[in-house]
Amino acid sequence: MTRFLAYTNPLLGHVYPIVPTLLELRRRGHEVSLYTGEAAAEALQRLGLRVRAVDPELERIENDDWKARTPIGAQKRDVENLARRGRLEIPDMERAIAQERPEALIVDVTAFGASAVAERSGLPWAHAVHFPVPIPSRDVPPYGLGLRPRHDVVGRIRDALARRLVLGLLERTILPPINEMRAGIGARPLEDASDYFARLAPLSLYYSAEPFEYRRSDWPPSFRLVGSGAWDPPAESLDWLDAVERPLVLITCSSDFQNDGRLVESALTGLAGEDVFVVATTAGVDPRGFATPANARLERYLPHGPILERAACVVCHAGMGITQKALAAGVPVCAVPFGRDQFEVARRVVVADAGVMLPKGRLRPRRLRRAVGEAMAKKAGAARVAAGFAAAGGAAAAAEALEEVASGRFGTARLPFVEAGSAAVPSRAARKAGERS
């Protein structure tokens, strides 16, 4: 039996993907404590998990990336907010370790401060990764712009230029405050993005899998792809679903406000005269601002699991959580990215042929209606993604990897998804040395 402590960013989309893993660890006889936001605490406590709230100041930091005018500007705001959170996480994570006396740690990859404490603790630990990971690769485009993979000369030139522009800008933005924060507790400075995302944690549990995630020949050996991590809080049955006979379309906004309410408005208007039944959950947006047509039901929150069992399509902001949850249920997606990692998620939907993407600048009721029809025809691609998620092993595979880390056995066997001959992502210094040789 091992005492595990998990620590996440307080946003729901950061804690929900790891819940099945935590429940599986408990089923295997381990003790599990979770530090996260108040919003998730009550539901998780009802499941028997030991849940404690993170510092309330962490929850007061607003994600204001939606105010930016460009995708790059939004990413700069996002990483600056994460750095602000990180400074608060350091004493909070130290408090959690002192109270829980864990033997192994699981840390949200966006919790930069908690990760620094984990690194310095001397305990076995792992990152939980719940978004398309920004690790450079010879096989995939650079993170951030949602570029389609290209493997010809033009693609390689494009990727090199974009990597220098986007990743370089992000590194110049986030590394100075992160390294200043890390220096305060004696942690070494980070050299680049790969230093953090690929080489810092002994294990990185990546909650995704092929064919949704792009195939890479150079995954870091610390990575395990374990599937979607789809989870919903337990809820009462939705009896009204039994009366729905038309094809059901689920519309949903981000649970973390990003001003994406016009997605719901366009969907309600565009699908009002169609032979479908629309269920819209507005989440971070107040539902009182919308008119509800006769063929729709509008709520702020509903459990998505029972709805997905009946759904023909999901229209969403391309958040990683709802997108993978839909695809894990075999439901195709109409993705309308608004920012954050959503351009990357939406592009993966298209490349996997599991749905369509509609840029938010082209979001109109008529265009959305057409896109929903096109997405409904992608059920075969969604089924392939669902099969890939299931084959990755899910919570059982994640728990097994965590047990290996806790016991010191991780890395003794070749990971099943790492191609023969693959190697860890080299540091920037190593790459430059290779270029000079």
Predicted regions and their residues:
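Conserved nucleotide-sugar phosphate-binding/catalytic loop shared by glycosyltransferases and other
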Residues: 34-78, 155-156
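Active-site-proximal region of nucleotide-activated glycan assembly enzymes
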Residues: 126-214
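N-terminal subdomain of nucleotide-sugar transferases
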Residues: 1-52
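A donor-sugar binding/catalytic signature common to diverse glycosyltransferases
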Residues: 105, 299-346
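C-terminal amphipathic helix plus adjacent low-complexity
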Residues: 100, 365-437
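Conserved nucleotide-sugar donor-interacting segment of glycosyltransferase catalytic cores
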Residues: 84-156, 211
